[in-house]
Amino acid sequence: MTELFIDGAWVAGSGPAFASRNPGTDDIAWQGASASAADVDRAIMSARRAFADWSALDFESRCAIAKRFAALLNERKEALAAAIGRETGKPLWEARTEVAAMAAKVGISIQAYQERTGEKRQDMADGVAVLRHRPHGVVAVFGPYNFPGHLPNGHIVPALIAGNTVVFKPSELAPGVAQATVEVWKDAGLPAGVLNLVQGEKDTGIALANHRQIDGLFFTGSSDTGTLLHKQFGGRPEIVLALEMGGNNPLVIGEVEDIDAAVHHTIQSAFLSAGQRCTCARRIFVPQGAFGDRFLARFVDVTSKITADVFDADPQPFMGAVISARAAAKLVDAQSRLIEQGAQPIIAMKQRDPRLGFVNAAIVDVTNVANLPDEEHFGPLAQIVRYADFDEAIARANDTAFGLSAGLLADDARAWEHFRRTIRAGIVNWNRPTNGASSAAPFGGTGRSGNHRPSAYYAADYCAYPMASVESAQLTLPASLSPGLHF
């Protein structure tokens, strides 16, 4: 099998064999050989050779290829959505939205480059001040499994249109989606060496991250891995490092008139994508008293009816499987640890089959857990915290080293003003789910949730560096000389 894409051609990997599986059926979705360290080196050197011509190509020509990529994505939407659903378990309805987001990213990235970077000129008394932006060179892109098309695409598209060349290492849990995506780039006319694909597991990633010929590393994934990368590159200021990581995100419920609307947004926040969005709400803050009791009862009632099924089921389910049987078992174990620490299960999570990734949406009350662990449980496990007053809710919501997303559901505009001023997060929503984000806005967080704003509008900032020039078309001796100079 030819599973690697190096220097414009599909080639076989020379590393160990591995496979991805459909988490809803346990069928093999993709199999092949991983990239060895030598394969990774070939990919990086191919990108290095391609950089001079690609970066010298005019911006409009680079954008034309990206636009062709977007058009082909739309033409192949159903096939790509099926590939995403097969490897991740997410339902087709949601996988289709991922492909649409991939295509839309091209126009957003082009606009972002022109508005945030690009070229600007300002006249001076004796010349012109010019601000240009230059690509870094060869950048490594590490993709996650939860959005294996959309999230790495949010690094790759702005990197390419800025003039960088890319070596892409996708998640080992979704290699088939990466292969299909790179095939679209190839068919869009991307020159050889500009985008290279190295498949593999941990050793492949280490070989790529440790290579001395990369100029940047753009990562979307877990906070633990991102933190290790941050430590690794701490002594290398020449490497641009963009990290988008996880969050222990809070959603605060106020006393609202429309309880069903609040329950809907809470379910979307906690359980969309089977809870496998980095912006999903992990901690739900519910007021004590009669209103909180009514809200919680309705939340439990609707949650108990949520269906989970295979990605191509008819009718379509709200949730699919989580990424693997192992991930499902880890979620159940996380719930058990919380219960051991004093949490009360309201809807207990169970794994349907030990071979599969199906778990039900779960709700546990952690109000009485004395030292609630500041951990991201990446799945449909909602933790309820009952609060006495609004300031207590905000204080406990901010009691985290993360800072990705936060939300408030409240009718009171004054409560919102107070919330947005005091909450600590990069994405803060009012009467919208925590995982709702505008593609035209920066995406990312503070603290252990990462740096920069990858995968969205502000990606242009880390895909090119500013180069300032003072220019004059004519070389002339100044009319006024500095003291001590004689001509």
From Swiss-Prot:
Binding residues for NAD(+): 221-226
| Positions of the catalytic residues | 244, 278
Instruction: Give the Enzyme Commission number.
Output: 1.2.1.71
Q: Which Gene3D superfamilies match?
A: Aldehyde Dehydrogenase, Chain A, domain 1, Aldehyde Dehydrogenase, Chain A, domain 2
Reactions the enzyme catalyzes:
N-succinyl-L-glutamate 5-semialdehyde + NAD(+) + H2O = N-succinyl-L-glutamate + NADH + 2 H(+)
Q: If you read the UniProt record, what top EC class would you report for this enzyme, in one word?
A: oxidoreductase
Q: What GO biological process term is on the record, naming one?
A: arginine catabolic process to glutamate
Q: In which pathway does it act?
A: Amino-acid degradation; L-arginine degradation via AST pathway; L-glutamate and succinate from L-arginine: step 4/5
Q: What does this protein do?
A: Catalyzes the NAD-dependent reduction of succinylglutamate semialdehyde into succinylglutamate.
What the record says about family reads: Belongs to the aldehyde dehydrogenase family. AstD subfamily.
Its protein name is N-succinylglutamate 5-semialdehyde dehydrogenase
Q: Which organism is it from?
A: Burkholderia multivorans (strain ATCC 17616 / 249)
Taxonomic classification = Bacteria, Pseudomonadati, Pseudomonadota, Betaproteobacteria, Burkholderiales
